[in-house]
């Protein structure tokens, strides 16, 4: 099973790259597949590539569900 997760763009870098964060963890990813990415945007990330923009509310709902599921598995 593959999982794509919402992450927030913190910094734009040269060559269609960006620094993104999720729960304090930063990663450099490609934004080549998404037009007009800006700092503060949420993108859906899969294997190092931003696949699409997602609105902040949807990103937060999705992340809350992922966290809830992870906590349920840990219990």
Swiss-Prot record:
Transmembrane segments: none annotated. Pfam families: HupF_HypC. Pathway: Protein modification; [NiFe] hydrogenase maturation. One of its GO terms (molecular function) is iron ion binding. GO terms for biological process: protein maturation. InterPro entries: Hydgase_assmbl_chp_CS, Hydrogenase_HupF/HypC. Involved in the maturation of [NiFe] hydrogenases. Involved in the biosynthesis of the Fe(CN)(2)CO cofactor. Belongs to the HupF/HypC family. This is Hydrogenase maturation factor HypC. The gene is hypC.
């Amino acid at each position: 099973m593959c999982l794509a997760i919402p992450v927030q763009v913190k910094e734009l870098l040269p060559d269609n790259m960006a620094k993104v964060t999720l729960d304090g963890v930063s990663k450099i990813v490609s934004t080549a597949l998404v037009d007009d990415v800006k700092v503060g945007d949420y993108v859906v990330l899969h294997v190092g590539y931003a696949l699409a923009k997602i609105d902040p509310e949807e990103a937060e709902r999705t992340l809350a569900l992922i966290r809830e599921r992870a906590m349920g598995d840990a219990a």
